[in-house]
């Protein structure tokens, strides 16, 4: 759970887990008592309605069946006159933990526990989890350890070139349900990825679902994602997702506070990479805006995590990768972000090739197989040209995005569960292509 207060309103977020301790159920309805004037800001894994002080959540088509011993979860962010009191909820008409299965079966069953559904409010871990024991070094961080930058190349603890290949989330606060262990484990074990990028929007046009609109809730969600990656022994990119405002220096003080918090929390974890400004735009120049901003933020991180890799965005939505060539940052273990969308940016490849040839450390922290809007048609031929070049050069990359939003760049079809173990039918054309590429290259 998380909570915050803004504009005289209380707010928070919950993830509720229903575990079936009895016979299989094929549908469920949960009811939660809520305070007055409760409004849902976002919700996932259920069909939600509010009447008076009761919020009703019914199953989606994909998560109605809960087998014995299995669990499902749903969640929501809200604003209200008061905070929601934590506690048990009702499931299928009965208080969770008593007899919330099929009532006729319950009445005829001598074992009162046979149809119990227990619902609990799930809280994130209070402390950072320990990295898993892996004496054979079979998972990414145990095998490759603290990464660094040498001669323009990302290298592992042994000084050997190492390429990160993975997925970026969409905005964490819009799709919080995808921040879960099963999803990330599927990316690691089935998609053959070694990194997850956590995109935390800073100030997305004033809708409140971003860091500036909900600092504590956004930070808690991001930390949940980082903790999961540490548990899974994966690398993770903490992305200060500057899209609005275009000039990252607008929120320099907030960025300092944020990176002080997260770099202190994760100081001893080689898993964590920091991306300090996603896509500067709107006239923000390298020497006039971005570099001076970076020179204020990098020392904050270095104080706590002196050896961490830091990615710095470049002008025009991280397309002008050449700008740092003549005016680089004077810090070790710094890389420069380049972003492309295959159906739009084919003309940028020669510039990238020139920068790499001159030894600029390039990290493709975001790319899409479609056009720059996130929509339109996929251009897999152009995507293959880009990724083949990156693989040859050992340049790391993350695909946008791991979510089920109804747009071309999503890897999951609308309505697909966030809980991993996805089948081929769950994937969009982009998802099928990306999974195949990551598994076979």
What are these regions (language model features)?
Residues 145-148, 171, 176, 252-273, ...:
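Extracellular glycoside hydrolase catalytic/binding regions
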Residues 122-195, 212, 432, 436:
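N-terminal carbohydrate-binding accessory modules
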Residues 180-244, 252-257, 298-304, 379-394:
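Aromatic-lined substrate-binding rim segments of carbohydrate-active enzymes
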Residues 29, 195, 235-237, 271-273, ...:
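Residues at or immediately flanking beta-strands
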